[in-house]
Structure formats: structure tokens, C-alpha cells
């Protein structure tokens, strides 16, 4: 009995903290690894993000969602809120007929206008067949944001209780244009902080 008391005295606080961390991990936060290039240049392939659960979903949040068809978690940006009409016309976003800026796309839109991202998709991380495939997609596109049929003008009506999610690299992202909108229950958290790599730790 005394040995157990001594154990608790020495390790009790540590075990309590460990238990609280484990419980908070289950209910309040998680981490996720970015897979692929769909969120370039905001988030890069392989980066690890700190994700907070149970936050209200706001437009332009970067969220983690569960894609049922592929049975996987994906990282995308919220563009359409429940009931919205989302329209794109030659890289201009209109939300319920109001033109809305997307500053996070400015860099890649400029590169698209310069050389259709051919230099970008020839750089580090785009070696081999991946780079060839991405360059061919970009060459066919007449705008940076197109639908699945490469139309530059298209629209969505977001059902009530659902959200339209798009990747920041619109040319290569598989998102709501391909798999449809996401229910609130399928959005598991908001990415708030970059944990890895060390050179890019911080918010985005």
C-alpha cells in the first residue's frame, strides 16, 4: 500500500496531465498530415497541421473533412456556406451574385497567367509522371478555377446543412467539384496551426 502511495506521489501529477492530454486529443483537437498538392501554395505536401474540433464553420476556413467515397480525410477550404449560390466566371468568385476576392489564390493565378504554371509544375516535388500530368492539366485549362469539364463559367447551389469545399490549387485539387458538397457532420475540425516542418511553423 505504501509503495502505491509513493508511486502516486511521484507520478500522480504526470499521469493526470497525460490522461488530460489524451482526453483532450480525443474530444478537442487532432493533427493531420497534408497529402498531395491540392492546397498549394498555402499548405505543402507532407506538412502537419494542428486541428481544433467543434468550432463553428466559417467561410474560407481551412478544414479537415471525411470523404466517404474514398474513406479518407482531406484538407480543403470552405467556399460555399449552406444555401449559397457560388458562381465562377473567368477566375472571379461570386457569392450570391456578389463578387468576392480570394487573396490566397493570387500567387498561383499570376503564375497561371505567366506560363500556365509550367515552371511551377516542373520544380521540386513535381518530378516524373506527376509533373507531366499536372502540366498537361494546366495546359488544357483556360482559367485557374474550372469545373470538371474545364468550363471557366459555372455555378453551384449549396444545399442547406452542407458546405462547398475547394482546394487552393484549383487545377489539381479533387474537391466538391468532383465529389459534391459535405455535410457538417463530415467536417471534423478546423486547421489552425502548422506544426511541421520547423521552418514553416505558425499560422497560415
Swiss-Prot record:
Enzyme nomenclature, EC number: 3.4.21.89
GO molecular function: serine-type endopeptidase activity
Membrane side Cytoplasmic: residue ranges: 1-10
Keywords: Cell membrane, Hydrolase, Membrane, Protease, Transmembrane, Transmembrane helix
Main location: membrane
One Gene Ontology term from the biological process aspect of the record: signal peptide processing
Coiled-coil residue spans: none
Subcellular location: Cell membrane
Gene label: lepB
Cellular compartments per GO CC: plasma membrane
Annotated membrane topology: Single-pass type II membrane protein
SUPFAM superfamilies with a match to the protein in the record: LexA/Signal peptidase (SSF51306)
Identification of the protein by name: Signal peptidase I
Substrates-to-products reaction catalysed: Cleavage of hydrophobic, N-terminal signal or leader sequences from secreted and periplasmic proteins
InterPro entries in alphabetical order: LexA/Signal_pep-like_sf, Pept_S26A_signal_pept_1, Pept_S26A_signal_pept_1_Lys-AS, Pept_S26A_signal_pept_1_Ser-AS, Peptidase_S26
Spans through the membrane: 11-30
Any Pfam family hit: Peptidase_S26
Catalytic residues (positions): 38, 76
Amino acid at each position: 500500500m505504501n509503495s502505491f502511495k509513493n508511486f502516486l506521489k511521484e507520478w500522480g501529477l504526470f499521469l493526470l496531465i497525460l490522461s488530460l492530454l489524451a482526453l483532450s486529443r480525443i474530444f478537442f483537437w487532432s493533427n493531420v498530415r497534408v497529402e498531395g498538392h491540392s492546397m498549394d501554395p498555402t499548405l505543402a505536401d507532407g506538412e502537419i497541421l494542428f486541428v481544433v474540433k467543434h468550432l463553428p464553420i466559417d467561410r474560407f476556413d481551412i478544414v479537415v473533412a471525411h470523404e466517404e467515397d474514398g474513406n479518407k480525410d482531406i484538407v480543403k477550404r470552405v467556399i460555399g456556406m449552406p444555401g449559397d449560390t457560388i458562381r465562377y466566371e473567368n477566375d472571379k468568385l461570386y457569392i450570391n451574385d456578389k463578387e468576392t476576392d480570394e487573396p490566397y489564390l493570387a500567387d498561383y493565378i499570376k503564375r497561371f497567367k505567366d506560363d500556365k504554371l509550367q515552371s511551377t509544375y516542373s520544380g521540386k516535388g513535381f518530378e516524373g509522371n506527376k509533373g507531366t500530368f499536372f502540366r498537361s492539366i494546366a495546359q488544357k485549362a483556360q482559367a485557374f478555377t474550372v469545373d470538371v469539364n474545364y468550363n471557366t463559367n459555372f455555378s453551384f447551389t449549396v444545399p442547406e446543412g452542407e458546405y462547398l469545399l475547394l482546394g487552393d490549387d484549383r487545377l489539381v485539387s479533387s474537391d466538391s467539384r468532383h465529389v459534391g458538397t459535405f455535410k457538417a457532420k463530415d467536417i471534423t475540425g478546423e486547421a489552425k496551426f502548422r506544426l511541421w516542418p520547423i521552418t514553416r511553423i505558425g499560422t497560415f
